[in-house]
Amino acid sequence: MALPRLTHLQFLVIAELSRGSARGRHLRGCLEEAGVRQSGPAFYQMMAGLEDAEYVSGWYEQQIVDGQIIRERHYKVLAGGKRAWRESRDFYLRVIGVPRPGLAYGA
């Protein structure tokens, strides 16, 4: 049984992105709600790794707030990220002895 390719933090991020694209700030908030304390640079370094692995795609969106141009990073999950997430989920389900979702017991 091969180990999962995703870390626990990457697993959480891809799970959130499976709901739809999101801003980096939103994803950091989700990690905080899960009890993860991570600096901004560490978060964006992790996201760059997910982009390099072609698990997520990132882009900047620009808006003007109080006369200032603000660029925010947005992300969406790619097919490779969904596959890596499912493989990680299935790994942990096997470890605890739970059948994979969608399969009949004993299949």
Describe the predicted segments one by one.
Residues 2-42:
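N-terminal helix-turn-helix DNA-binding core of bacterial DNA-binding proteins
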Residues 6, 68-70:
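Short coil/turn motifs at beta-sheet boundaries
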Residues 29, 51-52:
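Alpha-helical residues within the helix-turn-helix
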Residues 44-48:
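Short, hydrophobic-biased segments on the C-terminal half of alpha helices
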Residues 53-68:
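Beta-hairpin "wing" of winged helix-turn-helix
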Residues 80-107:
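Amphipathic alpha-helical dimerization/coiled-coil segments
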